[in-house]
Amino acid sequence: MEPGSMENLSIVYQSSDFLVVNKHWDLRIDSKTWRETLTLQKQLRHHFPELADPDTCYGFRFCHQLDFSTSGALCVALNKAAAGSAYKCFKERRVTKAYLALVRGHVQESQVTINYAIGRNSTEGRTHTMCIEGTHGCENPKPSLTELLVLEHGLYAGDPVSKVLLKPLTGRTHQLRVHCSALGHPIVGDLTYGQAEDQEDQPFRMMLHAFYLRIPTQAERVEACTPDPFLPALDACWSPSTCVQPLEQLIQALRTDPDPDPMSGGPRPCSPSTPQPRPGRPPPETEAQRASCLQWLSEWTLEPDN
C-alpha cells in the first residue's frame, strides 16, 4: 500500500454542510508541530481552500477523531451550525459507527459482546494508554461496550487471523484496540496494545479501518461507507480461508437499521438477539459541558477516540 500524500485525498460523501473523507492510515488529523509536513487538515486545505474557515485554529471542524494509525471514514463540518448539529448527535449517542479489523487468532464465537470498563493507565511509562478495569494502575474506568462479529478466518503472513466487524456501542479512547486486546485477540499491527513483534515481522500498518459512519442530523442524514482495505488483492499477506458471515449482509442490516432514539442511550447492536443494557434518560447538559461544546465548535483537540 502506498503511503499518504497531499494528492491522495478520497472523499466518500459531500454536501453543502459536510464532507466525509476516507482518511489514510498513519496520518494525523491536524498538528501544530512544524515537522508534520502532511496532515488531513493540510490535505483538505490543498484540495478545498475555499472551504477553510479562518475563524478556526485548523481551518476545518472535524466532528470526531481517528487515531494516527487508523484509516477510514471521518466527518468534517463545513460551518458552525453543521458542527453544532453533529455535536448534538454525538452527545445524544445517535451516531452509528462500524469498523473493520484483522485480529490475531481465530475468534471461535461468530458474535461477541465485549463488556469491559475502560480507564486511563497511570502506570509509569504507560500513561498515554488505556486499560480495562482491574488492571494495575487503571484510573476512573467507565462502562464500555463493543460488538464484534466475525467475518472470515484465515492467515496473515502465515499466522492465524480473523477478519471482524467492530461496532462500538460506547465511545471511549482507544476502545476497540483495548477491547480486542482484552479479549485475547489484539489487532494486527497494534504495537501499543498488541503482541510484541520482531521489527522485521511488523505489518506495514495497524489493521483497523473505520468502514461505516452515519450521523442523523436534523437537516440531513450523513451516511458513508468506505472501501474495504483488507482484501487479498490489496494485501498479499492476507489469505482468508473460511467465510463466517458475509460483510454485505451485515452492512445492509446497518443501513436499514432505524436511527437510534436519543432517549435509548445509544445505537442498537447489529443483531437483535444480543441483549444490551439500556441506560435511562440522559442527564441535562451542564454548564461545563456547554462551555466544552462552544470550545469544540471553534477549534479541535488532538486526543484520539479509537
From Swiss-Prot:
GO terms for molecular function: pseudouridine synthase activity; RNA binding. The keyword NAD does not apply. The active site is at 67. Keywords: Acetylation. GO terms for biological process: pseudouridine synthesis. Residues 269-285 have a biased composition (Pro residues). Pfam families: PseudoU_synth_2. The modification N-acetylmethionine is found at residue 1. Residues 255-290 are annotated as: Disordered. The keyword Membrane does not apply. Belongs to the pseudouridine synthase RluA family. This is RNA pseudouridylate synthase domain-containing protein 1. It comes from Mus musculus (Mouse).
